[in-house]
Amino acid sequence: MFTLKKPLLLIVLLGIISLSLCEQERNADEDEESEIKRGIFPKIIGKGIKTGIVNGIKSLVKGVGMKVFKAGLSNIGNTGCNEDEC
């Protein structure tokens, strides 16, 4: 009985080791695929998104800037009090 336990234990250990190595190799392959996908996304789509965001911010700043400028011009002579009060 004892002589059967050693080879069985050896087979189980070798099986566990081989499964572990296969899993590590599979994980490495999945990491490479995800890196490739991440590398493609910013190059193709990222440029369009960046351009859209920058253009949107520029137009927003221009619109808000003009409103602030116009509001400032209308308030230049206005001190905030009536002529009778000051």
UniProtKB/Swiss-Prot annotation:
Q: Which Pfam families match?
A: FSAP_sig_propep (PF03032)
Q: Where is the signal peptide?
A: 1-22
Q: Which GO terms describe its cellular component?
A: extracellular region
What InterPro entries does the database record attribute to this sequence?
Frog_antimicrobial_propeptide
Ordered alphabetically, the record's keywords are: Amphibian defense peptide, Antibiotic, Antimicrobial, Cleavage on pair of basic residues, Disulfide bond, Secreted, Signal
Disulfide-linked positions: C81-C86
Q: Which residues form the propeptide?
A: 23-36
- Subcellular location(s) of the protein: Secreted
Main location per UniProt? secreted
Q: Name the GO terms of the biological process aspect.
A: defense response to Gram-negative bacterium; defense response to Gram-positive bacterium
Tissue-level expression: Expressed by the skin glands.
Q: What does this protein do?
A: Antimicrobial peptide.
Q: Which family does it belong to?
A: Belongs to the frog skin active peptide (FSAP) family. Brevinin subfamily.
Protein name listed in UniProt: Palustrin-3b
- Protein source organism: Odorrana versabilis (Chinese bamboo leaf odorous frog)
Organism classification, top ranks?
Eukaryota, Metazoa, Chordata, Craniata, Vertebrata
